[in-house]
Amino acid sequence: MAAEHPEPPKGELQLPPPPPPGHYGAWAAQELQARLAEIGAPIQGSREELVERLQTYTRQTGIVLNRPVLRGEDGDKAAPPPMSAQLSGIPMPPPPMGLPPLQPPPPPPPPPPGLGLGFPMAHPPNLGPPPPLRVGEPVALSEEERLKLAQQQAALLMQQEERAKQAAVLMEQERQQEIAKMGTAVPRPPQDMGQLGVRTPLGPRVAAPVGPVVPTPTVLPMGAPVPRPRGPPPPPGDENREMDDPSVGPKIPQALEKILQLKESRQEEMNSQQEEEEMETDTRSSLGQSASETEEDTVSISKKEKNRKRRNRKKKKKPQRVRAASSESSGDREKDSGRSRGSDPPAADVEIEYVTEEPEIYEPNFIFFKRIFEAFKLTDDVKKEKEKEPEKLDKMESSAVPKKKGFEEEHKDSDDDSSDDEQEKKPEAPKLSKKKLRRMNRFTVAELKQLVARPDVVEMHDVTAQDPKLLVHLKATRNSVPVPRHWCFKRKYLQGKRGIEKPPFELPDFIKRTGIQEMREALQEKEEQKTMKSKMREKVRPKMGKIDIDYQKLHDAFFKWQTKPKLTIHGDLYYEGKEFETRLKEKKPGDLSDELRISLGMPVGPNAHKVPPPWLIAMQRYGPPPSYPNLKIPGLNSPIPESCSFGYHAGGWGKPPVDETGKPLYGDVFGTNAAEFQTKTEEEEIDRTPWGELEPSDEESSEEEEEEESDEDKPDETGFITPADSGLITPGGFSSVPAGMETPELIELRKKKIEEAMDGSETPQLFTVLPEKRTATVGGAMMGSTHIYDMSTVMSRKGPAPELQGVEVALAPEELELDPMAMTQKYEEHVREQQAQVEKEDFSDMVAEHAAKQKQKKRKAQPQDSRGGSKKYKEFKF
C-alpha cells in the first residue's frame, strides 16, 4: 500500500506527500478497483467514476492513497512493507488536542501457514517481522497538533475494526444463503471444529466459515460497505492453536485476519477473471458455471436482473425438492442434491438472457454519452408480469402435494424462503404510494411561473391542480372572476362576524331630507297611545292618508338629490370584513374630512375652508409635495379664500412664497391670472386691404347702391321665403289663421320646428274654451243631447294632416313671379272657398247610419237577456 520513500530522519513523523496532479488518473482499472475494495467503496463503473471516487475519498478524509503493487499470476511480486507512519494504506494523522502522541501499534503475530503474500497487514512468512516503527518525539509539532494526530489515529483504527465487523457479518449471511440455495443439509461438525466463537473487540461472536464456500455474486447499493472477498480458510488446527495460545502478545482479531486473507485470494481470482473476460464475447449458456464467472457477469448486471435470475433458479429447484422429498429418504436426498448440483442442467431448462456488454472507454465525454442511452433503456415491467404468472402456478402445485416433511424441515424451508424474499425485497427500490408519486411529479411554483405566459396570477396552491397550466390560463383570461378566498379557509363562511354587532338599517341621506322618518316616528307614538278599542276600529275601517308629504319634495328627493349606492367593480368579490376597510378611492388629496379636522383642532362647518391647515407654513418654506405636482393648495400655489389675509396671526395664511422680485414661486398665489385682473388691451383696427389698390370712384359706388336697391325689390328666388297670399291656405278645409288678422307680407315656407323648440319662445296654451251650440231636437242619436260644442276651432288648431306636414300649399312656378298684391287677393279667395265648403257639409247621413247600427244591437241583445234571466229563475231554489 505504501510507495517506497527515503527513510525519514529519526525523531520526525513521516507525513504523506501530497499527490501530484493526475495522481489517480495514471492508474490502471485493476489498481483503482483494488484500492477501492480496500477502503470499502463500490468497485463497479467506468474508469472515470473509479478515479472520481478515490479523489472524493482523499478530499473528505485527507488520506493520500499510494499506487498498489498488484501480484501477477506467478505470485512472485510482493507488496513492500508499509511505511512507518502508514498501516494498510492509511496515513497516520497528527495527534488530536489534549492527548499524548499515539504510539504505533505493535507488530501483528505471524499469520498461519498458507496466508497469501499480498496480505497487507501481515508480512511474507519467509521475511520475518518488519522493522520496528521509528517514531520519536516530534520536534516540529506542537502539543496541540500531537493531540489531534492521536485522536485521528484512534478514530481510524475504530473505523477499521467496525468495517471488519460488518464484513464478517455479511460473509456469514452469504454463506447461509448459499447453503439454502443449494438445498443440501450440510452436516454440522462438532462445536470445537465447525464453529469457532471469535469475539472481536467491537462486536459479538462471529462464526467462522468452515469448508469450501462457493462465493455468490452480490450487488450492493452505492455507499454500502463492500464485503471482503473470501478465499480458502486456514486449517482448523492453526485456528485452535492460535486460540489456545494466550501467551502471545496483542493480536489482530482473528475475524479480521480471516477477512483480509479471503480478500487477498479474492483479488487473485478477480485479476485472472478480468483477463479471461476480455477474450469472451458470447453469453454464458449454462447455469452451473463457476462462481468466478457468475460474479464477473453480475458486475455489469443491475439489481433487477440479478433478482430475476435468483427467482428463476428458485422456481426450477422447488419441483426438484418436492419430488425428491416424496420419493427418497433424507440421506438419498442429500446424495441426489449433491449430484444434481455437480451435474449440468439439461439443455431444455437453459434460459438464455442477453446482457449487453459495457465497453471500457476511458474518455471523459463518454460518461455523458452513456447517460443519454441509459434514459432510453427498455423497462422490465412486461417481463415481471410474465414471471409472476408461473410463480402463482408453482405455488398452487406445491400446495396440492402432500407434505411428508417433518416439523423441523418445514420450519427450515420456511425460514429459507422468508430470507430469500427479504433478500429480494431489500435491493429493490421502495414502493411509493400514489400520494407520494403525485408529490414527486408536481411542479414547483417557480417552474410553473416559468412555463406560463402570466406568472403574476400564479398562486401557491395552483401547482396542486389536475392541470396547472390550464388553470393559470383560465385565471389569466380577461373578465374572469376569481374563486372566493374562503374556499380554503378552515372556518365557515361569515362565522367570524359573530361578535360584531349589526347596526339597524339607516335610510339614505336624500330620503332623510324629506322628513318622512320624523313623521313616521310621530305616527307610531300616536298609535302606541291609542286604546285597543280604537285600534280594532281602525282595522275594520282604516283611515288613509295619515302621512301627508309634499309630492314635489318627494320627487326632488329621488330625481334630484338621489345618490348612487356604493357598488363594487366587476370581478371584485366580497370577503369577510370588507366593509370595515378604508376605501382610499373616496379620499382625495387636499379634501379634509370632518374627522381629520376635529383631530387637528380645526373648525367644522360651512366656513371651515377659511382656516388654513397646520402644514401650510412648512409647505410655504419647503415647497409643495412632489407626489402631487398639480394639487392646488390655497396660500401656496393658488389664491386664499375671500375675506382671509396672509400673516402669522390666528387664522392667518402665513407668508406667500415669492422670489427676490416678488414673483410667486410655485403658482398664482395672489390670483392675478383671473379674468377680472387682466387688463383688456383694446385691439387697434387693422386695414386688411392690399396696399397699393386703386380707390373706387364715385360712379362705381353709385352703381353698387342701385344694385343693392334692385336686389331688395326682387322676390326671394331661393325658396326659403313664400309670398303671403299663397302660403297660409290649408288644403284640409280649415283655416289656420283666424279672420281679422293682418296678412303678413312674407311667410317662411319651411317650418323651423327644431330651432323654435330650442329657443322655447312660444309657450303652449293651457286650455281652449269651446263655444256652445243649442239644438231643438235630439234626433235618432243614442246619446243625443241639446247641448253641442263647436269643435271647429280645436280642429283648426291641430294643424294639417300628418301626411301633408311639409308644404301646405303647392304653387305653380309662374305664380311665384306675381306681385305681392296679386298673392294677397289669391289668398283671400281661397279663404272664402273653404268657409263655403264648411257651411255646405252636412253630417246628418252619418248620424242616421250610426243610430241604425245602435238599434240593431239593442234588438239582438233583448231576447238573449230574457232567456238567460228565466233560466236562472228556474234553477234558483231555497
UniProtKB/Swiss-Prot annotation:
Q: Which residues carry this modification: N6-acetyllysine?
A: K258
Q: Which InterPro entries match?
A: DUF382, PSP_pro-rich, SAP_dom, U2_snRNP_Complex_Component
Sequence ranges of Pro residues compositional bias: 91-114, 122-133, 224-237
| Basic and acidic residues biased stretches | 1-10, 260-269, 330-342, 383-397, 405-414, 827-852
- GO BP field: mRNA splicing, via spliceosome
Chain positions with Symmetric dimethylarginine modification: R491
Concerning PTM, the database record says: Methylation at Arg-491 by PRMT9 is required for the interaction with SMN1.
| Record localization | Nucleus; Nucleus speckle
Residue ranges with Low complexity bias: 201-221
Region (Disordered) residue ranges read: 1-25, 67-136, 183-356, 383-436, 674-740, 827-878
Q: Which PROSITE patterns has this protein been placed in? A: SAP
List, as start-end ranges, the regions of compositional bias called Acidic residues: 695-715
Omega-N-methylarginine occurs at: R205, R228, R230, R491, R498
Q: Which residues carry this modification: Phosphothreonine?
A: T281, T294, T763
Instruction: List residues, modification Phosphoserine.
Output: S272, S290, S292, S300, S343, S414, S418, S419, S844
By its UniProt entry, which Pfam families does this protein fall under?
DUF382 (PF04037), PSP (PF04046), SAP (PF02037)
Tell me where in this chain the SAP domain is found. 24-58
**Region (Required for interaction with PRMT9) location:** 384-533
List residues of cross-link (Glycyl lysine isopeptide (Lys-Gly) (interchain with G-Cter in SUMO2)).
K10, K263, K383, K395, K475, K526, K753, K773, K826, K840
Q: Which UniProt keywords apply?
A: Acetylation, Coiled coil, Isopeptide bond, Methylation, mRNA processing, mRNA splicing, Nucleus, Phosphoprotein, Spliceosome, Ubl conjugation
Q: Which GO terms describe its cellular component?
A: catalytic step 2 spliceosome; nuclear speck; nucleus; spliceosomal complex; U12-type spliceosomal complex; U2-type precatalytic spliceosome; U2-type spliceosomal complex
Output the superkingdom of the source species: Eukaryota
Coiled-coil parts of chain = 140-177
Q: What does the function comment of this entry state?
A: Component of the 17S U2 SnRNP complex of the spliceosome, a large ribonucleoprotein complex that removes introns from transcribed pre-mRNAs. The 17S U2 SnRNP complex (1) directly participates in early spliceosome assembly and (2) mediates recognition of the intron branch site during pre-mRNA splicing by promoting the selection of the pre-mRNA branch-site adenosine, the nucleophile for the first step of splicing.
Q: What is this protein called?
A: Splicing factor 3B subunit 2
Q: Tell me which species this is from.
A: Mus musculus (Mouse)
